[in-house]
Swiss-Prot record:
Cellular-component GO terms for this entry: cytoplasm; nucleus; ribonucleoprotein complex
Organism phylogeny: Eukaryota, Metazoa, Chordata, Craniata, Vertebrata
Quaternary structure (record): Oligomer. Oligomerization is required for RNA-binding and EDEN-dependent deadenylation.
Family of the protein in this entry: Belongs to the CELF/BRUNOL family.
UniProt name for this protein: CUGBP Elav-like family member 1-B
PANTHER family documented for this protein: RNA BINDING PROTEIN (PTHR24012)
Keywords: Activator, Cytoplasm, mRNA processing, mRNA splicing, Nucleus, Repeat, RNA-binding
Organism: Xenopus laevis (African clawed frog)
Length: 489
């Protein structure tokens, strides 16, 4: 085909103005026309020139408009990234000009839902042709060739597509369909990507919450009896006065533990207490609490009475009622959780002269409470600990005691220190969180380290997070090797 053929005075209404790059600077409109006319009649070629030079010199690129859309697309398919012109090092770059994006296919393509499965492409074209020229119509079909009851059609202009939506959306119910016809703009690639990422994020958050909650229920087995009894007495009948015994240990934070509780949250915490109590083989701590107004008497009874929790793991099935607890307790304020942290400090000072076994038991008990709080209230617990830990832990490389330092591999590329900190803080107090960055590319190496202040938290994190899936990969979480080893992991 050449430029001497008969053709209209103007290009077709759906023609495309194309940008062409990687053109020899020595080429004029004549050489370019000879190249492109083999694909169709050329309406116009405009070589971009540097006007600051005299005479103006080609910039090595141009705009070209064919008389037909078909010719432009054929030229693009044959030349773009395919043909290298004389004297050039890279192949031709050919794509619609920026001005053509206003008429992109995605802006003119419609999705048609609730289509009768008896309809074919011609039926759809006939139904919508009243609104303008249709470039393409396609019925979605399954592997068996049967219609899926939906279709795509592409008009030559966006205004035609808009008229079709206005006139046809839910205007009729087709044969064999339970709802009126659906006519809307088809999802763009960007829309599809956003939906996919949103769904993936929701799934990951659900998995993370589930892992935090059920992976740490074993921590309830280490709760000292007085904590379970205190929780049960506190929440039953909305009686909050029993928390007054915590004031000497937690100060104003003990009040904060109750200020955010409503009736529904109290009821669910009572469910927790009842379920946890079912896992115990002794009621002595509960009676000790009921007859005592001093926290020291509770601690004394804890230290002198044996706590037989060895068989409690067999009763963990009774904790199934906790599944809805995380959502129901969403109204707890950050001060409530801060009270738990303050409680730990108060207990430590109150027991400075206590026996080693008593202090160890209470340390385990607090660890269980801390992990349960993270499981039941992941979002708020994270907020509280971010304010307490985030300033010092994120980005630092301090090490915790032996057995409390973790190596994490297969992290998402976009994860930073704060993301790593937030993911692992539900399992205990974090000393440091560090994602390693490639100094050359300034990109994450997809691994990092977490250090807790105790080995119990590290083991809880391994149990819940090792193998946890994020995107297409699963986290690898393991103890960091000793300094004496040749490799840190």
């Amino acid at each position: 085909m050449n430029g001497t053929m008969d053709h209209p005075d103007h290009p077709d209404s759906d023609s495309i103005k194309m940008f062409v790059g990687q053109v020899p600077r020595s080429w004029s409109e004549k050489e370019l026309r000879e190249l492109f006319e083999q694909y169709g009649a050329v309406y116009e070629i405009n070589v971009l020139r540097d006007r600051s030079q005299n005479p103006p010199q080609s910039k090595g690129c141009c705009f070209i408009t064919f008389y037909t859309r078909k010719a432009a697309l054929e030229a693009q398919n044959a030349l773009h990234n395919m043909k290298v012109l004389p004297g050039m090092h890279h192949p031709i770059q050919m794509k619609p000009a920026d001005s053509e994006k206003n008429n992109a296919v995605e802006d003119r393509k419609l999705f048609i839902g609730m289509v009768s499965k008896k309809c074919n492409e011609n039926d759809i074209r006939t139904l919508f042709s009243q609104f303008g020229q249709i470039e393409e119509s396609r019925i979605l079909r399954g592997p068996d060739g049967m219609s899926r009851g939906c279709a795509f059609i592409t008009f030559t202009t966006r205004s035609m597509a808009q008229m079709a939506i206005k006139a046809m959306h839910q205007a009729q119910t087709m044969e064999g369909c339970s709802s009126p016809i659906v006519v809307k703009f088809a999802d763009t690639q960007k829309d599809k990507e956003q939906k996919r990422m949103t769904q993936q994020l929701q799934q990951q958050m659900q998995q993370l919450n589930a892992a935090s909650m059920w992976g740490n229920l074993a921590g309830l087995g280490s709760l000292a009896p007085q904590y379970l009894a205190l929780l049960q007495q506190t929440t039953s009948s909305g009686n909050l006065n029993s928390l007054s015994g915590l004031h000497p240990m937690g100060g104003e934070y003990a009040t904060g533990m109750t200020s955010g509780l409503n009736a529904m949250q109290l009821q669910n915490l009572a469910t927790l207490a009842a379920a946890a109590s079912a896992a115990q083989n002794t009621q002595s701590a509960g009676s000790a609490l009921a007859s005592s107004s001093s926290p020291l008497s509770i601690l004394t009874s804890s230290g002198s009475s044996p706590n037989s929790n060895n068989s409690s793991i067999n009763h963990m099935a009774s904790l199934g009622a906790l599944q809805t607890l995380a959502g129901a307790t969403a109204g707890l304020n950050v001060g409530s959780l801060a009270g738990m942290a303050a409680l730990n400090g108060g207990l430590g000072s109150s027991l400075s002269n206590g026996t080693g076994s008593t202090m160890e038991a209470l340390s385990q008990a607090y660890s269980g409470i801390q992990q349960y709080a993270a499981a039941a209230l992941p979002s708020l617990y994270n907020q509280s600990l971010l304010s307490q830990q985030g300033l010092g832990a994120a980005g630092s490389q301090k090490e915790g005691p032996e057995g409390a330092n973790l190596f994490i591999y297969h992290l998402p590329q976009e994860f930073g220190d704060q993301d790593l900190l937030q993911m692992f803080m539900p399992f205990g107090n974090i000393v440091s969180a560090k994602v390693f960055i490639d100094k050359q590319t300034n990109l994450s190496k997809c691994f990092g380290f977490i250090s807790y202040d105790n080995p119990v938290s590290a083991q809880a994190a391994i149990q819940s997070m090792n193998g946890f899936q994020i995107g297409m990969k699963r986290l690898k979480v393991q103890l960091k090797r000793s300094k004496n080893d040749s490799k840190p992991y």
